[in-house]
Each structure stands twice: as C-alpha cells, then as structure tokens.
C-alpha cells in the first residue's frame, strides 16, 4: 500500500487497557503492514501518558485534550478508551464530527447514556465499532466453525469467574462480555431470567437465556470465585465444544464428537497476548473496514442489547 492511502489513526485514552488492548495491537499491525496506517496522535488528560505512548508505540503527536487533537490533526479513525462515564459523550463527539470510531463497552455508565449514544450513532451515519474482543478470539471462531460443520447448536453456556472483584458495576462493566459473546454465538435474546445470589462479598448471578434462534443458554457470573477463568461451551446432538479464553490456566479449545475427543488446540506459552485474546484481530478488522470503506462490526447498535440486558439486571438488583 502506498503512502497516499495510509489510514491515519488517533488513540484517545492512554491507560493500562488502552495499552494492552489497543496500542500494542496497533503497533504490531503497523510493523506488519508498513505504510498502511499512521499513528498520528495519542491523547490523555495526563499528557505524560500520551507522551509515553509516542515513545513506546510510535504515535507522532501527544495531546491532553481531544478538542485540540481534532482541531490540529486530520484523522481517518479514532479509538476512544475512556472511563464508562465518558464513553457516551466522547463517542457522540466523534460521531457528530463524522470521524469513524471505536468505543469501549459498556457504552456508558447508565442506561440513558447507552441509549443516547445508540440514537446518535444511527442519526449520524458515521461508521462505528465497539471493542468487544471476545468476538474476535481465534480459538472461539475456530470452535464456532467446527461446531457449524458438526451440526446445530442447541445449548450454550459461559462461566465467567474472577478473583476479588466486588465492585457493584461488575455485572454491566465486565460480565457484559459473556452476554455479548453468547449473543454473537446464538443470536438475539428472546427472553432471559436472572437469579442473584447475595451471600458473600459480592453478588453472583445465574442468567438463563432463550434466544430467538431456539438455542437455550446460561451464564454463571462468579466475580469472587478465587480464580480468573472464562469458558464457553457449545453443545449439540452428538457433539460438544469448550473454549477457554481469554482467561484461564490453559487457553484454547477442545471438541468432542460421539464420545471421543476429536480436536484440541492450546495457546503456546510464548504466544503474544493480543493474538490470543482477539485484540489484534479486532484492530485489524477496524483498519480493514476503513481501508475498504465497509461497515465496521460489531457496531454500537450490535452491542447495545448486551449492555441493556446487564444494566437491567443491575437496576433490578438495586430496586430501580
């Protein structure tokens, strides 16, 4: 690709998640596809963090204010990694300026912010994408391809276990990953029921789902279970697939058919994290959409129902 067709990108927010989930994949993509992208700016309210991203990952300019960045730089896309209470307003700013953007889940800190962002995204017509890396995990997608060839999925299940995560927003800020991934696998949710278990230091959740496709499923959300693991199970007549990713002692996938283990694949210890957890593949998908002028996926409209389910559970828990 020649320099005239280079995609110019900015990153807003330079914290830990921005680094592991976005800066590292962007730098990898640039190194593997010279001249295809330009990392024109990094922005953070703490200017020293933006400057560090410039030094470490090759961003050209550093800013402490998004308005200054947008007034000085010409960009083709922006990745915004900001706290939940800033996601909606930052996303709306970019959408209204018709800058194709990636925003983070959970799209807002309250349901009204999520709904406003979704409305503005539809009204603006600006290409947009939500960072939900599970949809891009190679192990999950290879397992889905295998299951599709094996037969029809009848049941899906996720166990999302964490250690010492007692924050009240866990159900909508983190567990939304599980809901969104099952929607990615099985389609739109027709109805759901949630049982909240209040014993211990944090609420645990058992969420039963019926999908419009007829598939049934369940999510067990265990934020203080003393371990960090995320496992997805896909079951059909005569077959079962298990995917452990992005967290677990041993990450990969296994498939059983007619009582026998037929396929297994595990991540080698030296495999870079962003290649395992889908962050690199997500980054590549956004860049590809900008390059091809196609519609990025998943969009705000695609992911908003996942957030709405989780926030409705949280609101019911506190009696709203």
Feature names for model-found ranges:
Residues 1-57:
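N-terminal Rossmann-like dinucleotide-binding module
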Residues 17, 45, 270-284, 298:
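Active-site loop of classical SDR/Rossmann-like NAD(P)-dependent oxidoreductases
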Residues 103, 128-130, 243:
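Hydrophobic residues in well-ordered beta-strands that form the structural core
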Residues 131-138, 160-192, 302-303:
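Mid-domain beta-loop-alpha active-site segment that forms a flexible
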Residues 57-119:
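Beta-loop-alpha module in the N-terminal Rossmann-like domain of NAD(P)-dependent dehydrogenases
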Residues 85, 108-165:
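A contiguous active-site-proximal alpha/beta segment in oxidoreductase catalytic domains
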Residues 1-6, 77-82, 126, 285-320:
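C-terminal helix-rich "cap/oligomerization" subdomain common to oxidoreductases
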Residues 173-249, 280-294:
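Contiguous beta-strand/loop segments that form the cofactor/metal-binding neighborhood of enzyme cores
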């Amino acid at each position: 690709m020649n320099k005239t067709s280079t995609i110019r990108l900015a990153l807003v927010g330079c914290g830990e998640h921005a680094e592991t989930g976005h800066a590292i994949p962007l730098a990898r993509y640039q190194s593997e596809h010279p001249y295809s992208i330009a990392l024109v700016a990094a922005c953070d309210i703490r200017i020293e963090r933006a400057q560090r991203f410039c030094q470490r990952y090759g961003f050209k300019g550093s800013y402490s204010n998004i308005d200054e960045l947008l007034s000085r730089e010409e960009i083709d896309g922006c990745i915004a990694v900001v706290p939940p209470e800033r996601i909606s307003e930052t996303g709306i700013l970019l959408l209204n300026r018709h800058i194709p953007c990636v925003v983070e889940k959970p799209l807002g800190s309250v349901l009204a912010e999520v709904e406003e962002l979704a409305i503005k995204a539809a009204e603006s017509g600006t290409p947009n994408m939500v960072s939900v890396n599970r949809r891009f995990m190679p192990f999950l997608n290879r397992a889905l391809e295998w299951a599709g060839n094996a037969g029809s999925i009848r049941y899906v299940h996720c166990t999302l276990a964490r250690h010492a995560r007692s924050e009240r927003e866990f159900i909508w800020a983190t567990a939304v990953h599980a809901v969104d991934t099952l929607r990615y696998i099985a389609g739109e949710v027709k109805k759901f029921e949630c049982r909240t278990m209040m014993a211990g230091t944090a609420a645990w959740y058992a969420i039963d789902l019926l999908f419009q496709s007829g598939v049934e499923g369940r999510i067990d959300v265990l934020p203080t279970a003393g371990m960090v693991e995320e496992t997805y199970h896909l079951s059909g007549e005569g077959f079962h697939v298990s995917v452990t990713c992005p967290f677990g002692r041993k990450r990969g996938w296994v498939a059983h058919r007619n009582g026998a283990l037929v396929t297994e694949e595990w991540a080698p210890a030296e495999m870079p994290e962003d290649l395992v957890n889908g962050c690199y593949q997500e980054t590549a998908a956004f860049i590809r959409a900008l390059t091809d002028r196609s519609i990025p996926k998943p969009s705000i409209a695609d992911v908003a129902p996942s957030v709405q389910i989780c926030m409705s559970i949280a609101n019911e828990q506190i009696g709203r």
